[in-house]
Amino acid sequence: MAHKKGLGSSRNGRDSNAQRLGVKAFGGETVTGGTIIVRQRGTRIKPGLNVGRGKDDTLFAKADGRVEFKDRGNLGRFVSIVPAKA
């Protein structure tokens, strides 16, 4: 007879951290240059006017202004920054 109870082992018990993807600045919001607009994997949304694309496909503002999303049919969805009138 065993003196101690045999302990089972489980192959579960792991989970990865969320990647926190998605739109960070929504349409109509005012942003400053360098603000992250969208964190994404792949180019689900493409950069438009005054928007840059990082190496991980993150879209960011190149200038101060208002965020504007546009769906251009077969060309896809674009995000642009409309500069604030001085």
UniProtKB/Swiss-Prot annotation:
One of its GO terms (molecular function) is structural constituent of ribosome. It comes from the Bacteria. SUPFAM superfamilies: Ribosomal L27 protein-like. PROSITE patterns: RIBOSOMAL_L27 (PS00831). The keyword NAD does not apply. GO terms for biological process: translation. InterPro entries: Ribosomal_bL27, Ribosomal_bL27_CS. One of its GO terms (cellular component) is cytosolic large ribosomal subunit. Keywords: Ribonucleoprotein, Ribosomal protein. Belongs to the bacterial ribosomal protein bL27 family. This is Large ribosomal subunit protein bL27. It comes from Koribacter versatilis (strain Ellin345). The gene is rpmA.
